[in-house]
């Protein structure tokens, strides 16, 4: 199983989109400052995740979410899809 996920930093008011096969470990890595982009910008809160059958499906959704022009579009998508897998 793979996951596409969105985490949020309240202190910086930013979202990060990613995909992984181990969701809990990946979020812990973001909060442990072991990721270049998210380092020092936490704490990070998981606001959305969706379980997918393959990595290619997870990457496809990740790319779609990263293609949104701004965080407001991403936030609207999260609100529309809330409850799909992981509630905000």
Give residue spans per PLM region.
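GIY-YIG nuclease catalytic motif and its immediate N-terminal context
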Residues: 1-36, 40-52, 56-66, 71-88
């Amino acid at each position: 199983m793979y996951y596409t996920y969105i985490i949020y930093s309240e202190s910086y008011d930013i979202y990060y989109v990613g995909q992984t096969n181990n969701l809990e470990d990946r979020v812990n890595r973001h909060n442990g400052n072991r990721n270049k982009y998210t380092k020092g910008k936490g704490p990070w809160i998981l606001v959305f995740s969706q379980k997918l059958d393959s990595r290619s499906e997870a990457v496809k959704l990740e790319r779609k979410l990263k293609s949104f022009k701004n965080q407001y579009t991403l936030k609207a998508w999260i609100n529309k899809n809330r409850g799909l897998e992981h509630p905000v």
